[in-house]
């Protein structure tokens, strides 16, 4: 394919006042690919709750505050329009569709990378955090690390899967839940949660209980959950006895779930979720609560000793899990629930997130 014409300037959305939800559309230079890099003309980018945490500086786990002028975003899909020196060795060609993930670059050499945990790379670069993100029309990516997008999978559908889809798929694998076993998805109607429900129920043969606000019930059940639990119907001052008893009653012999995936960023959800487990159960922590860190309120030593429960974390998937997630979508096993918006709408989207009103995902049309 002949090389397309590449402009000198591009549109991008920056965080103009980190600590708030304010964004601004600006004009930036189109970058030149370096050695082993490709230039990607992005057409779509998902908007993730992680972007919200980064732009508002409410993720206290991050080492540095976000700086004004940061281009956010880490769920970008587009076409390769230029190859840097050496990039052809990757097999990529002009016109290939690829995706840019949360971890935009991993070294491939450190101990985590060598163990297949490139999401924990010691030398990682995070798209949209001290690295230019995907809320722009052109971005650079390492030729060996961008994710191929399968033919037949629309770019807008692929975008949310590059973070949300990959993240929950990896967390489901870490839960070690087996086909036919019960799994609870906390935050089941959110951007991550509704994808976790689909992958669990339709891709892995798990029996799913979705937990979320009542307004999310239709989406959660449509995604494949057998049961839905409305958290607003239960008290919080009873040490979560009522809701945990109810969730357990939905499982085989009332023993509880084999696993829980906490997709929401709620400290209360973490305290509840640990109590949903049966003996030898596993809770996987995915959602990152904002502001000052808090311990899980129900994490008493006696609980771990008496029930042999396990708690683990899951950040993002590796490059192979990203490819596997795309294959799920290409086969129609999963489909993100999303709406499309223009770049100029990003501030309003973040306001929806701030108010807890957002269902599913939002994908930016970057044209």
UniProtKB/Swiss-Prot annotation:
Sequence positions that bind Zn(2+) 1: 48, 74, 163
GO biological process: alcohol metabolic process
Coiled coil segments of this chain: none
EC nos: 1.1.1.1
Family matches, as Pfam families: ADH_N, ADH_zinc_N
UniProt GO MF annotations: alcohol dehydrogenase (NAD+) activity; zinc ion binding
UniProt key word Oxidoreductase: yes
Keywords: Cytoplasm, Metal-binding, NAD, Oxidoreductase, Zinc
Co-factor note (free text): Binds 2 Zn(2+) ions per subunit.
Main subcellular location: cytoplasm
InterPro entries: ADH-like_C (IPR013149), ADH-like_N (IPR013154), ADH_Zn_CS (IPR002328), GroES-like_sf (IPR011032), NAD(P)-bd_dom_sf (IPR036291), PKS_ER (IPR020843)
Positions bound to NAD(+): 187-193, 212, 216, 286-288, 361
PANTHER family reported in the protein's UniProt record: ALCOHOL DEHYDROGENASE 1-RELATED (PTHR42940), ALCOHOL DEHYDROGENASE 2 (PTHR42940:SF5)
Similarity comment text for this entry: Belongs to the zinc-containing alcohol dehydrogenase family.
Subunit structure: Homotetramer.
Protein name, as recorded: Alcohol dehydrogenase 2
Native species: Emericella nidulans (strain FGSC A4 / ATCC 38163 / CBS 112.46 / NRRL 194 / M139)
Gene: alcB
